[in-house]
Amino acid sequence: MPFDARTRPLTAPQARVLATLLEKSRTVPDSYPLTLNSLLAGCNQKSSRDPVMQLTESEVQQALDELRQQTLVLEIGGARVARWEHNFTRGVGVPDQSAALLGLLMLRGPQTAGELRINAERWHRFADISSVEAFLDELQSRSDDKGGPLVTLLPRAPGAREPRWAHLLCGPVDASPVQMASASPASRSEEDGALAQRVQALEDEVAALRATVQRLCEQLGVAEH
């Protein structure tokens, strides 16, 4: 049976762990699946995260164990260190494009369709905003037998040009305009998105280098310092 957020919504740590696995599978495929240490670093990174979290290793491990019970993540046995990968598309029953949008919403919070298209550049290249909106509409109109809607369109905040979308994987969201009153204009969002992409690209390069060093250490049988 598909994942149903209405009866068993994700916790905040579960959503962060799952979304981080989704992100890294697309942005740093050479270092994926992730070790627990790499996953912890990805969950707690400061760029491309809203809110920024400071999860502990035990909290990440607990989230992994809980997600594994729901078949949303899989543990891959390694030579020395266990690695983890998501099973999101099959577990939730959505295509890759929808998985990318949901992952971004879990990592960065509510976003407009335009912001999602910009932020998804390294996840999936959508042809235009209309294609993003088409997948969002599909997620919003998801039937009950498939687990119900997975996103909702929030009311447009005062001063904002466009309404924002939010995911429902953690249950219903507070759609009050007060919560979203700080929404920035589209031009500012594009600038912030471009900067965040550059920072994310650098962090992904560092993560890939760390993963390479870790695998070399595993092959040589030496401890990583």
Curated annotation (Swiss-Prot):
SUPFAM superfamilies on file: Winged helix' DNA-binding domain
Q: Which Pfam families match?
A: DUF480 (PF04337)
Could you tell me which InterPro entries the record lists for this protein? DUF480 (IPR007432), WH-like_DNA-bd_sf (IPR036388), WH_DNA-bd_sf (IPR036390)
Stated family? Belongs to the UPF0502 family.
Name this polypeptide is given = UPF0502 protein Dtpsy_2730
Per the UniProt record, the source organism is Acidovorax ebreus (strain TPSY) (Diaphorobacter sp. (strain TPSY))
